[in-house]
């Protein structure tokens, strides 16, 4: 699990200073990018190696309101992995109170620059092994 610290910006909120629901998906992406940086495979490196990882599905369950100027910890875990697909799960918690604010999940495949699904174990075994080393049990279990 990797923990990504995120301060809420005023522009992400409505007139009641409540974070708009669409921003959580961005927070998941930021946390996932941080996760990849932590394992020495930032998106820039993957792009250089002609690999992309498009989102196949995304879900978010909102538990508690997030407001400006809250500070969040987005916990991201790789919970499922095979040669062509990866699943990440997220827990969004208040950095001070540790109150759970949201949970989420994203599923991704691996494609080459032509957009064709590829086996990451074959096309980039070092990246695949780095992911295998991070594989954890589901947050929901």
Protein language model regions, located:
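Catalytic strand-loop segment that frames the active site of acyl-thioester-processing enzymes
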Residues: 1-37
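HotDog/MaoC-like acyl-thioester-processing domains
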Residues: 2-4, 67-68, 79-141
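Acidic-residue sensor for enzyme active/binding pockets
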Residues: 12, 29-30, 61, 89, ...
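Catalytic cores of transferase enzymes with a strong primary signal for eukaryotic protein kinases
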Residues: 15, 42, 72-75, 113, ...
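A broad, structural micro-motif
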Residues: 19, 53-55, 101
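Residue-level recognition of specific faces of alpha-helices
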Residues: 24-27, 54, 89
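Solvent-exposed, charged/polar functional surfaces in cytosolic regulatory/catalytic domains
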Residues: 34, 61, 130, 134
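Hydrophobic beta-strand-centered segment that forms part of the acyl-chain substrate-binding groove
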Residues: 35-86
């Amino acid at each position: 699990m990797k923990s990504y610290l995120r301060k809420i910006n005023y522009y992400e909120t409505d007139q009641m200073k409540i974070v708009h629901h669409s921003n959580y998906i961005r927070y998941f992406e930021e946390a996932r990018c941080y996760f990849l940086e932590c394992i020495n495979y930032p998106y820039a490196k993957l792009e250089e190696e002609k690999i992309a990882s498009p989102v196949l599905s995304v879900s978010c369950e909102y538990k508690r309101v997030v407001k400006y100027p809250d500070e969040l910890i987005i916990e991201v875990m790789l919970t499922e992995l095979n040669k062509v697909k990866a699943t990440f799960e997220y827990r969004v918690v208040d950095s001070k109170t540790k109150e759970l604010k949201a949970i989420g999940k994203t599923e991704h495949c691996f494609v080459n620059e032509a957009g064709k699904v590829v086996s990451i174990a074959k096309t980039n075994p070092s990246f695949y092994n780095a992911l295998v080393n991070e594989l954890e049990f589901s947050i929901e279990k």
